[in-house]
Regions:
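Glycine-rich, aromatic-lined ligand/substrate-binding cores of catalytic
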Residues: 151-168
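Short, flexible coil/linker elements and helix-boundary hinge sites characteristic
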Residues: 13, 136, 161-162
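Active-site catalytic motif of lipid deacylating hydrolases and related acyltransferases
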Residues: 1-65, 113-123
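Serine-dependent carboxylesterase/thioesterase catalytic core
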Residues: 47-155
Length: 168
């Protein structure tokens, strides 16, 4: 949740991946940071990422990509691998929410709190992150994000998009 590639300008900005992308580039790796909605369902984020993967493949001429996802980015990259396995060489999840989050469950259980948080996230925080990435078209939907992030949402996702990487 609330992921971004870079917010701000070079002189005054924040890199989500800190120095990882420049370090990989210095060592000869072609790297791209995706720009996807900071708050959305895994499938919506996955479709956004899939479009960018197709652009990277067209731009580089490489047949496959290696995807790295942090937090909600883990299930997001798994979605791409599930729907277009021919595009994916490898997946790496860092602190990924493959089995859901009890915090998401607790937030969803608190209707009043979720509604208030949704207003702030969907209309203030999410748009600020999207604008900060110079991509104000990225929409935010906290409820969809939390539902995907929840333990039940993760179980449904894992059944729909199975992987041998997760033990039963």
């Amino acid at each position: 949740m609330f992921g971004f590639s870079r917010v701000g300008v070079a002189e005054l900005g924040l890199d989500y991946w800190y120095q990882i992308l420049p370090a990989l580039a210095r060592n000869g790796t072609t790297t791209f940071a995706a720009q996807i909605s900071p708050l959305e369902s895994t499938e919506v984020r996955g479709e956004q990422l899939l479009q960018q993967v197709e652009e990277v493949i067209a731009l580089t001429g490489k047949p496959k990509v290696n995807l790295i996802g942090h937090s909600h980015g883990g299930p997001t990259i798994r979605y791409v691998e599930a729907v277009k396995p021919q595009y994916v060489a490898s997946l790496t999840g860092v602190g990924a929410t493959f089995r859901g989050s009890k915090v998401a469950d607790q937030l969803l259980a608190n209707q009043g709190g979720t509604q208030l948080l949704s207003l702030a996230a969907d209309y203030i925080i999410g748009p600020m992150l999207a604008y900060g990435q110079s991509n104000p078209a990225l929409k935010s939907n906290l409820t969809a994000s939390l539902t995907s992030f929840s333990e039940q949402g993760s179980r449904v996702f894992n059944q729909k998009y199975p992987t041998s990487a997760l033990a039963s």
